[in-house]
């Protein structure tokens, strides 16, 4: 029962869209109505409101970290297996991608996945985020940074995580993130992908 509660709570937490929350707080248009129409930090940044984008980024990453941290704590208290941690990680990510509060139409999960990785292993999170930052600095393309980071995250996880089920969870999250970027991949191949801070 505790396992079900932890995983379902993680999904509900993931369903909270901080892009929508931040846009409401800063009196901005709904992020689903402009730019890439993606409720994420990069799209919110297109409004020019860096503070709103920061709130979105920290909120989306924070919920990923909290879900994993709660599962770890619950696992210790109730002596649950690593399956609960993996389940919570996947649930919070799926909540962000398919939020019940937004008719199951959510974001692409970049910030949330970063929070999840930090929760699983700080070095895993730091390595993946560093990969994103380096690619972003060179290319100024958020989606390319996310895609390369997603490709490398399972490799980092293989060396940093001891449990196979956690490595599997990271791999599934990476695959889902890449699938969510299908349109971005097409735009990248066509040379039409927007750069960070620019209109889509």
Curated annotation (Swiss-Prot):
Subcellular localization, as worded in the UniProt entry: Cell inner membrane
A GO biological-process term: phospholipid biosynthetic process
Membrane topology summary: Multi-pass membrane protein
Position of the signal peptide: none
EC number: 2.3.1.275
Annotated keywords: Cell inner membrane, Cell membrane, Lipid biosynthesis, Lipid metabolism, Membrane, Phospholipid biosynthesis, Phospholipid metabolism, Transferase, Transmembrane, Transmembrane helix
Database matches in InterPro entries: G3P_acylTferase_PlsY
Keyword Lipid biosynthesis: yes
Gene Ontology cellular component list: plasma membrane
Reactions this protein catalyses: an acyl phosphate + sn-glycerol 3-phosphate = a 1-acyl-sn-glycero-3-phosphate + phosphate
Chief site of localization: membrane
Pathway annotation from the record: Lipid metabolism; phospholipid metabolism
Pfam family, one: G3P_acyltransf
Enzyme class: transferase
Molecular function as annotated in GO: acyl-phosphate glycerol-3-phosphate acyltransferase activity
NCBIfam families cross-referenced by the UniProt entry: glycerol-3-phosphate 1-O-acyltransferase PlsY
PANTHER family in the cross-refs: GLYCEROL-3-PHOSPHATE ACYLTRANSFERASE-RELATED, INNER MEMBRANE PROTEIN YGIH
Family statement drawn from the similarity comment of this UniProt entry: Belongs to the PlsY family.
Role noted for this protein: Catalyzes the transfer of an acyl group from acyl-phosphate (acyl-PO(4)) to glycerol-3-phosphate (G3P) to form lysophosphatidic acid (LPA). This enzyme utilizes acyl-phosphate as fatty acyl donor, but not acyl-CoA or acyl-ACP.
Protein name in the entry: Glycerol-3-phosphate acyltransferase
């Amino acid at each position: 029962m505790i396992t079900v509660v932890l995983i379902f709570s993680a999904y509900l937490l993931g369903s909270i869209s901080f892009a929508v929350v931040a846009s409401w707080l800063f009196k901005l248009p709904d992020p689903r109505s402009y730019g890439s129409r993606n409720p994420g930090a990069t799209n919110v940044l297109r409004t020019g409101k860096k503070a709103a984008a920061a709130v979105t980024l920290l909120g989306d990453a924070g919920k990923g970290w909290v879900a994993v941290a709660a599962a770890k704590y619950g696992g210790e208290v109730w002596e649950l297996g690593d399956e609960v941690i993996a389940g919570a990680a996947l649930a919070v990510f799926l909540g962000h991608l398919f939020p019940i509060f937004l008719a199951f139409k959510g974001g692409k999960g970049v910030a949330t996945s970063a929070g999840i990785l930090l929760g699983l292993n700080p070095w895993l999170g730091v390595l993946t985020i560093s990969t994103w930052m380096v690619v972003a600095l060179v290319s100024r393309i958020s989606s390319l940074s996310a895609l390369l980071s997603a490709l490398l995250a399972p490799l980092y996880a293989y060396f940093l995580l001891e449990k196979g089920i956690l490595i599997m969870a990271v791999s599934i999250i990476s695959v889902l993130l890449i699938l969510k970027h299908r349109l971005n991949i097409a735009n990248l191949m066509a040379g039409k992908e927007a750069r960070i801070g620019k209109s889509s």
